[in-house]
Amino acid sequence: MDLKITNGFYDPSHLSYEVVERKGLGHPDTLADGIAEQIEIDYSLYCLDKFGVIPHHNFDKIIIRGGHSVQDFGGSDFIEPIKIIFLGRASKKCFNSSIPLFKIQKKAATKYLNRILPNLDVENYVEFETLTSDFTTKTNWFSPEAIEDLPEYLDVPKANDTATMISYWPLTISEELALMIEGYFYKLDKNELPTPRFTKMGGDIKVMVVRNDLEYSIRINFPLISKFFNNDIESQLYVDKHVEKIKKYIEQKYKNISFSIDYHYYLTTTGSCIDFGEEGAVGRGNKTHGIISSFRPNTMEAPAGKNCTYFVGKVWGFLSDTIAKEIYEAFNTPCQIIMQLNIGSKLYRPTHLFIQTEESVDQERVLEIVNRHLNNGKQNTNLILSTQHFIPKTNVYDG
Protein backbone atom coordinates (compact mmCIF):
# COMPACT_ATOMS: atom_id res chain seq x y z
CA MET A 1 0.00 0.00 0.00
CA ASP A 2 1.36 3.38 -1.06
CA LEU A 3 0.40 5.57 1.90
CA LYS A 4 1.22 9.27 2.03
CA ILE A 5 0.29 11.55 4.93
CA THR A 6 0.86 15.27 4.35
CA ASN A 7 -0.23 18.55 5.91
CA GLY A 8 -1.02 21.92 4.36
CA PHE A 9 -4.53 20.95 3.22
CA TYR A 10 -7.04 23.79 3.05
CA ASP A 11 -10.76 23.21 2.73
CA PRO A 12 -13.06 25.58 0.76
CA SER A 13 -13.71 27.77 3.82
CA HIS A 14 -10.31 29.34 3.09
CA LEU A 15 -11.42 30.46 -0.38
CA SER A 16 -13.04 33.83 -0.98
CA TYR A 17 -16.20 32.12 -2.24
CA GLU A 18 -18.07 28.80 -2.11
CA VAL A 19 -21.03 27.27 -3.93
CA VAL A 20 -22.89 24.37 -2.29
CA GLU A 21 -26.05 22.65 -3.54
CA ARG A 22 -28.36 20.23 -1.76
CA LYS A 23 -30.91 18.18 -3.67
CA GLY A 24 -33.56 17.36 -1.08
CA LEU A 25 -34.73 13.91 -0.07
CA GLY A 26 -37.71 14.20 -2.42
CA HIS A 27 -35.67 15.25 -5.46
CA PRO A 28 -35.97 12.65 -8.27
CA ASP A 29 -32.24 11.85 -8.24
CA THR A 30 -32.12 11.56 -4.45
CA LEU A 31 -35.20 9.32 -4.56
CA ALA A 32 -33.44 7.06 -7.06
CA ASP A 33 -30.38 6.84 -4.79
CA GLY A 34 -32.53 6.06 -1.77
CA ILE A 35 -34.62 3.41 -3.49
CA ALA A 36 -31.50 1.71 -4.87
CA GLU A 37 -29.88 1.62 -1.44
CA GLN A 38 -33.04 0.40 0.29
CA ILE A 39 -33.23 -2.49 -2.20
CA GLU A 40 -29.56 -3.32 -1.62
CA ILE A 41 -30.08 -3.41 2.15
CA ASP A 42 -33.29 -5.46 2.04
CA TYR A 43 -31.91 -7.91 -0.53
CA SER A 44 -28.70 -8.40 1.46
CA LEU A 45 -30.55 -8.93 4.74
CA TYR A 46 -32.99 -11.36 3.12
CA CYS A 47 -30.13 -13.44 1.71
CA LEU A 48 -28.11 -13.35 4.93
CA ASP A 49 -31.15 -14.61 6.82
CA LYS A 50 -32.02 -17.34 4.31
CA PHE A 51 -28.61 -18.43 3.04
CA GLY A 52 -26.05 -16.98 5.44
CA VAL A 53 -24.33 -15.16 2.56
CA ILE A 54 -24.90 -12.21 0.25
CA PRO A 55 -24.88 -13.44 -3.37
CA HIS A 56 -23.58 -11.32 -6.23
CA HIS A 57 -25.69 -8.33 -7.20
CA ASN A 58 -25.65 -4.63 -7.97
CA PHE A 59 -28.75 -2.43 -7.88
CA ASP A 60 -27.04 0.88 -8.70
CA LYS A 61 -29.00 1.34 -11.93
CA ILE A 62 -32.52 2.61 -11.26
CA ILE A 63 -34.57 5.05 -13.33
CA ILE A 64 -37.62 7.01 -12.23
CA ARG A 65 -39.85 8.23 -15.05
CA GLY A 66 -42.01 11.04 -13.79
CA GLY A 67 -45.77 10.82 -14.02
CA HIS A 68 -48.20 13.36 -15.45
CA SER A 69 -50.36 15.43 -13.15
CA VAL A 70 -51.58 18.97 -13.77
CA GLN A 71 -50.84 21.23 -10.82
CA ASP A 72 -53.64 23.42 -9.53
CA PHE A 73 -54.78 24.79 -6.20
CA GLY A 74 -57.00 22.32 -4.40
CA GLY A 75 -55.08 19.32 -5.77
CA SER A 76 -55.29 17.08 -8.81
CA ASP A 77 -54.95 13.42 -9.71
CA PHE A 78 -52.48 11.73 -12.02
CA ILE A 79 -53.24 11.47 -15.73
CA GLU A 80 -50.28 9.11 -16.17
CA PRO A 81 -48.60 7.23 -13.29
CA ILE A 82 -45.00 7.46 -12.13
CA LYS A 83 -42.89 4.52 -13.29
CA ILE A 84 -39.85 3.07 -11.53
CA ILE A 85 -37.61 0.75 -13.53
CA PHE A 86 -35.18 -1.53 -11.71
CA LEU A 87 -32.03 -2.33 -13.70
CA GLY A 88 -28.66 -3.69 -12.61
CA ARG A 89 -27.84 -7.37 -12.18
CA ALA A 90 -28.58 -9.79 -9.37
CA SER A 91 -28.65 -13.42 -8.34
CA LYS A 92 -32.21 -14.68 -8.67
CA LYS A 93 -31.39 -17.93 -6.94
CA CYS A 94 -28.83 -19.09 -4.41
CA PHE A 95 -27.86 -22.63 -3.41
CA ASN A 96 -30.63 -23.86 -5.74
CA SER A 97 -33.35 -21.85 -3.96
CA SER A 98 -35.13 -19.00 -5.70
CA ILE A 99 -34.95 -15.39 -4.49
CA PRO A 100 -38.16 -13.32 -4.88
CA LEU A 101 -36.24 -10.46 -6.47
CA PHE A 102 -39.08 -8.34 -7.84
CA LYS A 103 -41.03 -8.70 -4.60
CA ILE A 104 -38.01 -7.45 -2.62
CA GLN A 105 -37.45 -4.57 -5.04
CA LYS A 106 -41.08 -3.43 -5.05
CA LYS A 107 -41.50 -3.73 -1.28
CA ALA A 108 -38.27 -1.81 -0.60
CA ALA A 109 -39.16 0.97 -3.05
CA THR A 110 -42.68 1.28 -1.63
CA LYS A 111 -41.35 1.46 1.93
CA TYR A 112 -38.89 4.18 0.97
CA LEU A 113 -41.42 6.28 -0.96
CA ASN A 114 -43.97 6.04 1.86
CA ARG A 115 -41.45 7.53 4.29
CA ILE A 116 -40.15 10.34 2.07
CA LEU A 117 -43.36 11.23 0.18
CA PRO A 118 -46.28 10.40 2.51
CA ASN A 119 -48.71 12.21 0.18
CA LEU A 120 -47.92 9.81 -2.67
CA ASP A 121 -50.44 7.00 -3.12
CA VAL A 122 -47.88 4.43 -4.25
CA GLU A 123 -50.39 1.64 -4.81
CA ASN A 124 -52.44 3.64 -7.30
CA TYR A 125 -49.98 6.06 -8.86
CA VAL A 126 -46.66 4.22 -9.15
CA GLU A 127 -45.87 1.39 -11.55
CA PHE A 128 -42.86 -0.87 -11.07
CA GLU A 129 -40.93 -2.84 -13.67
CA THR A 130 -37.83 -4.97 -13.19
CA LEU A 131 -35.29 -5.35 -15.97
CA THR A 132 -32.65 -6.63 -13.56
CA SER A 133 -30.73 -9.38 -15.32
CA ASP A 134 -28.42 -12.20 -14.31
CA PHE A 135 -26.38 -12.09 -17.52
CA THR A 136 -22.66 -12.80 -17.20
CA THR A 137 -19.80 -14.75 -18.74
CA LYS A 138 -18.89 -16.26 -15.35
CA THR A 139 -20.32 -19.66 -14.49
CA ASN A 140 -22.72 -19.56 -11.52
CA TRP A 141 -21.77 -15.96 -10.76
CA PHE A 142 -25.41 -14.91 -10.42
CA SER A 143 -26.70 -18.34 -9.45
CA PRO A 144 -24.26 -19.73 -6.85
CA GLU A 145 -24.76 -23.42 -6.17
CA ALA A 146 -22.11 -23.71 -3.44
CA ILE A 147 -19.93 -21.45 -1.33
CA GLU A 148 -17.15 -21.98 -3.88
CA ASP A 149 -19.16 -19.82 -6.29
CA LEU A 150 -18.75 -16.89 -3.87
CA PRO A 151 -14.95 -16.50 -3.76
CA GLU A 152 -15.12 -13.44 -1.49
CA TYR A 153 -16.34 -15.77 1.29
CA LEU A 154 -13.45 -18.19 0.84
CA ASP A 155 -10.59 -15.73 0.54
CA VAL A 156 -9.75 -12.10 1.11
CA PRO A 157 -12.26 -10.11 -0.98
CA LYS A 158 -10.86 -8.70 -4.20
CA ALA A 159 -11.73 -5.29 -5.62
CA ASN A 160 -14.35 -5.49 -8.36
CA ASP A 161 -13.13 -2.38 -10.17
CA THR A 162 -10.36 0.14 -10.63
CA ALA A 163 -11.72 3.22 -8.91
CA THR A 164 -11.02 6.24 -6.75
CA MET A 165 -12.94 7.28 -3.63
CA ILE A 166 -12.72 10.63 -1.88
CA SER A 167 -13.95 11.92 1.46
CA TYR A 168 -13.30 14.77 3.86
CA TRP A 169 -14.32 16.14 7.24
CA PRO A 170 -15.51 18.45 8.69
CA LEU A 171 -18.04 20.33 6.59
CA THR A 172 -17.70 24.07 6.08
CA ILE A 173 -20.41 26.44 7.31
CA SER A 174 -21.75 26.71 3.75
CA GLU A 175 -22.02 22.93 3.52
CA GLU A 176 -23.66 22.68 6.93
CA LEU A 177 -26.17 25.38 6.00
CA ALA A 178 -27.28 23.51 2.88
CA LEU A 179 -28.03 20.41 4.94
CA MET A 180 -29.55 22.08 8.00
CA ILE A 181 -31.93 24.27 5.97
CA GLU A 182 -33.40 21.24 4.25
CA GLY A 183 -33.20 19.38 7.56
CA TYR A 184 -35.46 21.99 9.17
CA PHE A 185 -38.35 20.22 7.44
CA TYR A 186 -37.52 16.78 8.91
CA LYS A 187 -37.59 14.85 12.17
CA LEU A 188 -36.33 11.37 13.00
CA ASP A 189 -38.72 8.41 12.94
CA LYS A 190 -38.55 5.37 15.24
CA ASN A 191 -35.76 3.93 13.05
CA GLU A 192 -33.69 7.13 13.33
CA LEU A 193 -34.37 8.02 9.69
CA PRO A 194 -35.66 11.40 8.46
CA THR A 195 -39.39 11.82 7.92
CA PRO A 196 -41.30 15.03 7.07
CA ARG A 197 -42.34 17.39 9.87
CA PHE A 198 -44.95 19.29 7.88
CA THR A 199 -47.87 17.72 6.00
CA LYS A 200 -48.25 20.61 3.56
CA MET A 201 -44.60 20.72 2.45
CA GLY A 202 -43.15 18.30 -0.08
CA GLY A 203 -39.71 16.72 -0.09
CA ASP A 204 -38.26 18.08 -3.35
CA ILE A 205 -36.58 20.99 -1.58
CA LYS A 206 -33.56 22.54 -3.31
CA VAL A 207 -31.08 24.61 -1.31
CA MET A 208 -28.23 26.60 -2.86
CA VAL A 209 -25.71 28.37 -0.65
CA VAL A 210 -23.27 30.85 -2.18
CA ARG A 211 -20.67 32.42 0.09
CA ASN A 212 -18.96 35.56 -1.21
CA ASP A 213 -16.27 36.45 1.32
CA LEU A 214 -18.30 36.61 4.56
CA GLU A 215 -21.74 37.03 2.98
CA TYR A 216 -23.97 33.98 2.57
CA SER A 217 -26.65 34.11 -0.14
CA ILE A 218 -29.19 31.32 0.29
CA ARG A 219 -31.75 30.23 -2.29
CA ILE A 220 -34.52 27.79 -1.32
CA ASN A 221 -37.08 26.18 -3.63
CA PHE A 222 -40.17 24.98 -1.74
CA PRO A 223 -42.54 22.29 -3.11
CA LEU A 224 -46.05 22.79 -1.73
CA ILE A 225 -48.70 20.05 -1.71
CA SER A 226 -51.39 21.58 -3.92
CA LYS A 227 -54.43 20.01 -2.22
CA PHE A 228 -53.75 22.00 0.97
CA PHE A 229 -53.81 25.44 -0.70
CA ASN A 230 -56.62 27.40 -2.33
CA ASN A 231 -54.71 30.35 -3.78
CA ASP A 232 -51.42 32.22 -4.01
CA ILE A 233 -52.08 34.28 -0.90
CA GLU A 234 -52.39 31.18 1.31
CA SER A 235 -49.26 29.72 -0.28
CA GLN A 236 -47.25 32.91 0.19
CA LEU A 237 -48.24 33.26 3.84
CA TYR A 238 -47.34 29.62 4.54
CA VAL A 239 -43.91 29.90 2.92
CA ASP A 240 -43.18 33.28 4.55
CA LYS A 241 -43.88 31.75 7.96
CA HIS A 242 -41.32 28.99 7.38
CA VAL A 243 -38.72 31.36 5.94
CA GLU A 244 -38.88 33.45 9.11
CA LYS A 245 -38.46 30.34 11.25
CA ILE A 246 -35.50 29.21 9.13
CA LYS A 247 -33.85 32.61 9.61
CA LYS A 248 -34.21 32.29 13.39
CA TYR A 249 -32.90 28.71 13.22
CA ILE A 250 -29.78 29.87 11.37
CA GLU A 251 -29.25 32.77 13.80
CA GLN A 252 -29.56 30.34 16.70
CA LYS A 253 -26.91 28.02 15.21
CA TYR A 254 -24.54 30.64 13.80
CA LYS A 255 -24.43 33.76 15.93
CA ASN A 256 -22.14 35.92 13.83
CA ILE A 257 -22.75 35.25 10.14
CA SER A 258 -24.34 37.61 7.64
CA PHE A 259 -26.86 35.96 5.33
CA SER A 260 -29.84 36.61 3.09
CA ILE A 261 -32.55 34.24 1.89
CA ASP A 262 -34.24 34.30 -1.49
CA TYR A 263 -36.90 31.73 -2.26
CA HIS A 264 -39.38 30.33 -4.73
CA TYR A 265 -42.32 27.99 -4.21
CA TYR A 266 -44.14 25.74 -6.62
CA LEU A 267 -47.10 23.38 -6.55
CA THR A 268 -46.82 19.60 -6.58
CA THR A 269 -49.31 16.79 -6.22
CA THR A 270 -47.25 14.63 -3.86
CA GLY A 271 -44.18 16.73 -3.07
CA SER A 272 -41.74 16.00 -5.90
CA CYS A 273 -41.10 16.92 -9.52
CA ILE A 274 -41.67 13.25 -10.38
CA ASP A 275 -45.33 14.33 -10.25
CA PHE A 276 -44.99 16.08 -13.60
CA GLY A 277 -42.51 14.23 -15.73
CA GLU A 278 -39.05 14.82 -14.28
CA GLU A 279 -36.77 11.80 -14.29
CA GLY A 280 -34.45 10.55 -11.58
CA ALA A 281 -31.39 8.30 -11.83
CA VAL A 282 -28.82 6.90 -9.43
CA GLY A 283 -25.60 8.90 -9.16
CA ARG A 284 -26.86 12.15 -10.69
CA GLY A 285 -27.51 13.92 -7.41
CA ASN A 286 -25.72 14.62 -4.16
CA LYS A 287 -22.13 13.50 -3.69
CA THR A 288 -20.07 12.87 -0.55
CA HIS A 289 -21.95 13.73 2.66
CA GLY A 290 -25.17 14.47 0.77
CA ILE A 291 -24.15 17.70 -0.93
CA ILE A 292 -22.74 18.99 -4.20
CA SER A 293 -19.86 21.15 -3.02
CA SER A 294 -18.39 22.82 -6.08
CA PHE A 295 -14.89 23.37 -4.72
CA ARG A 296 -14.38 19.89 -3.28
CA PRO A 297 -12.78 17.07 -5.26
CA ASN A 298 -15.22 14.25 -5.85
CA THR A 299 -15.52 10.89 -7.54
CA MET A 300 -18.07 9.75 -10.10
CA GLU A 301 -18.58 6.55 -8.10
CA ALA A 302 -22.21 6.29 -6.97
CA PRO A 303 -22.39 4.01 -3.91
CA ALA A 304 -26.19 3.73 -3.70
CA GLY A 305 -27.32 0.20 -4.57
CA LYS A 306 -23.81 -1.19 -4.98
CA ASN A 307 -22.86 -4.54 -3.46
CA CYS A 308 -21.56 -4.02 0.07
CA THR A 309 -19.26 -7.05 0.09
CA TYR A 310 -16.61 -6.21 -2.52
CA PHE A 311 -17.59 -3.17 -4.62
CA VAL A 312 -14.85 -0.53 -4.32
CA GLY A 313 -17.35 2.31 -4.75
CA LYS A 314 -19.34 1.06 -1.75
CA VAL A 315 -16.87 -0.38 0.74
CA TRP A 316 -14.26 2.32 0.27
CA GLY A 317 -16.85 5.06 0.19
CA PHE A 318 -17.76 3.93 3.69
CA LEU A 319 -14.14 3.57 4.82
CA SER A 320 -13.10 6.95 3.41
CA ASP A 321 -15.95 8.68 5.25
CA THR A 322 -15.25 6.83 8.48
CA ILE A 323 -11.48 7.31 8.49
CA ALA A 324 -11.68 11.02 7.56
CA LYS A 325 -14.07 11.69 10.45
CA GLU A 326 -11.97 9.77 12.96
CA ILE A 327 -8.76 11.55 11.97
CA TYR A 328 -10.50 14.91 12.37
CA GLU A 329 -11.89 13.91 15.77
CA ALA A 330 -8.47 12.67 16.89
CA PHE A 331 -6.51 15.79 15.90
CA ASN A 332 -9.14 18.54 15.49
CA THR A 333 -7.77 19.48 12.09
CA PRO A 334 -9.58 19.23 8.73
CA CYS A 335 -8.82 16.05 6.80
CA GLN A 336 -9.20 14.85 3.22
CA ILE A 337 -8.71 11.29 1.93
CA ILE A 338 -8.13 10.14 -1.64
CA MET A 339 -8.03 6.38 -2.15
CA GLN A 340 -7.29 4.48 -5.36
CA LEU A 341 -7.65 0.73 -5.79
CA ASN A 342 -7.05 -1.55 -8.78
CA ILE A 343 -9.34 -4.33 -9.91
CA GLY A 344 -8.31 -7.69 -8.50
CA SER A 345 -6.30 -6.16 -5.66
CA LYS A 346 -7.03 -7.07 -2.06
CA LEU A 347 -10.05 -4.97 -1.14
CA TYR A 348 -8.66 -3.86 2.20
CA ARG A 349 -5.22 -2.94 0.89
CA PRO A 350 -5.64 0.12 -1.37
CA THR A 351 -3.10 0.68 -4.12
CA HIS A 352 -2.73 4.35 -3.14
CA LEU A 353 -3.99 6.14 -0.05
CA PHE A 354 -3.36 9.87 0.27
CA ILE A 355 -4.30 11.55 3.56
CA GLN A 356 -4.08 15.32 3.81
CA THR A 357 -4.59 17.36 6.97
CA GLU A 358 -4.45 21.08 7.60
CA GLU A 359 -2.09 20.88 10.58
CA SER A 360 0.73 18.41 11.21
CA VAL A 361 -0.42 15.22 12.90
CA ASP A 362 1.13 12.18 14.55
CA GLN A 363 1.61 9.92 11.53
CA GLU A 364 1.94 6.78 13.62
CA ARG A 365 -1.42 7.46 15.19
CA VAL A 366 -2.97 8.10 11.77
CA LEU A 367 -1.57 4.79 10.56
CA GLU A 368 -3.09 3.07 13.59
CA ILE A 369 -6.51 4.52 12.75
CA VAL A 370 -6.23 3.43 9.11
CA ASN A 371 -5.06 -0.09 9.93
CA ARG A 372 -7.76 -0.59 12.54
CA HIS A 373 -10.47 0.09 9.97
CA LEU A 374 -8.73 -1.98 7.30
CA ASN A 375 -8.34 -4.88 9.71
CA ASN A 376 -12.09 -4.88 10.31
CA GLY A 377 -12.15 -6.56 6.91
CA LYS A 378 -15.47 -8.19 6.10
CA GLN A 379 -17.01 -6.72 9.26
CA ASN A 380 -17.28 -3.48 7.28
CA THR A 381 -20.05 -5.10 5.23
CA ASN A 382 -22.11 -5.60 8.39
CA LEU A 383 -21.42 -2.01 9.46
CA ILE A 384 -22.60 -0.62 6.11
CA LEU A 385 -25.85 -2.56 6.46
CA SER A 386 -26.49 -1.94 10.16
CA THR A 387 -25.73 1.80 10.06
CA GLN A 388 -27.56 2.28 6.73
CA HIS A 389 -24.64 4.57 5.92
CA PHE A 390 -25.69 5.26 2.33
CA ILE A 391 -29.42 5.76 2.86
CA PRO A 392 -29.90 9.47 2.04
CA LYS A 393 -30.12 11.54 5.21
CA THR A 394 -30.13 15.19 6.22
CA ASN A 395 -29.30 17.26 9.30
CA VAL A 396 -32.73 17.01 10.90
CA TYR A 397 -34.19 19.88 12.90
CA ASP A 398 -32.99 20.10 16.49
CA GLY A 399 -34.13 23.58 17.42
Swiss-Prot record:
Top-level lineage group: Bacteria
Pfam family of the protein (one): AdoMet_Synthase
InterPro entries in the record: AdoMet_synthase_2, AdoMet_synthase_2_family, AdoMet_synthase_3
Similarity annotation: Belongs to the AdoMet synthetase 2 family.
UniProt-recorded name of the protein: Uncharacterized protein SPy_0538/M5005_Spy0445
Taxonomic source organism: Streptococcus pyogenes serotype M1
